[in-house]
Amino acid sequence: AGFYVDGNTLYDANGQPFVMRGINHGHAWYKDTASTAIPAIAEQGANTIRIVLSDGGQWEKDDIDTIREVIELAEQNKMVAVVEVHDATGRDSRSDLNRAVDYWIEMKDALIGKEDTVIINIANEWYGSWDGSAWADGYIDVIPKLRDAGLTHTLMVDAAGWGQYPQSIHDYGQDVFNADPLKNTMFSIHMYEYAGGDANTVRSNIDRVIDQDLALVIGEFGHRHTDGDVDEDTILSYSEETGTGWLAWSWKGNSTEWDYLDLSEDWAGQHLTDWGNRIVHGADGLQETSKPSTVFTDDNGGHPEPPT
């Protein structure tokens, strides 16, 4: 048993609704920080960590031992691991998507058996163009390949347009969902200046997914971005109101141009930034709203057998 979606709700392996409250960590670029950063993120109250991995397309490939290590660290710290391949970011090419899918299949021995603690975010922000039809065609093609390989995990699919074109999910999400023989696919919007720029945009983008009975997470968001402000207060409050998960971007290590998105000044989380304090200690933040998956709680959600 593992995570599954039913309607617009994600459930854990014990059949309890699970609302992600977590943080992104750029593992692919800072491979030696996992043993420091992952426990530090858990200490902030995160129930989920989204882990950036590389399939070798743009950065040094993360091998199967690395995947085992980061999943184990997440589990030890009672966090669900959302694993994602970052190399296809913003790319429209089908070959980039296929490479990510081939990577998950290559790594399946580290993933199979972890369905209760791991969610597979197939490819970060694949399909940069604002074209929902071509985006959907790609995922309709590859989701069955993952299932044929024996990966039964909940799958997460980022919106087109660098994750910021939720119209792609509004128009074609149902088609992508129906392409999954297990009907265990959820969707992710990345809320920066376009998808999260003001309160009405935030609310409408969330409503138009969950009103179709599709499960949603805000897989990345910031407080501002290259071309404008982000309404992080509404992202947090409306996510809490609607039971929508969120994963803030990102723990540390953003390049100089985007270092305002660092949540912490150090990998160990001794010194949070203003952004970090907002996410951890602010209204509707981690301390207020994050609850661990029942697969990690002492009574295992009322089930006597602990997860293996």
Curated annotation (Swiss-Prot):
Record SUPFAM superfamilies: (Trans)glycosidases
Enzymatic class: hydrolase
E.C. code: 3.2.1.78
Superkingdom classification of source: Bacteria
Catalytic activity, as annotated: Random hydrolysis of (1->4)-beta-D-mannosidic linkages in mannans, galactomannans and glucomannans
GO MF annotation, one: mannan endo-1,4-beta-mannosidase activity
Disulfide bond sites: none
Region (Disordered): 284-308
Keywords: Glycosidase, Hydrolase
UniProt entry tagged with the keyword Hydrolase: yes
Active site: 125 (proton donor), 220 (nucleophile)
Biased composition (Polar residues): 287-297
GO biological process assignments: glucan catabolic process
Function: Catalyzes the endo hydrolysis of beta-1,4-linked mannan, galactomannan and glucomannan. It is able to hydrolyze mannosidic linkages that are flanked by mannose or glucose.
Family, similarity comment: Belongs to the glycosyl hydrolase 5 (cellulase A) family.
UniProt-recorded name of the protein: Mannan endo-1,4-beta-mannosidase
Species: Salipaludibacillus agaradhaerens (Bacillus agaradhaerens)
Organismal lineage: Bacteria, Bacillati, Bacillota, Bacilli, Bacillales
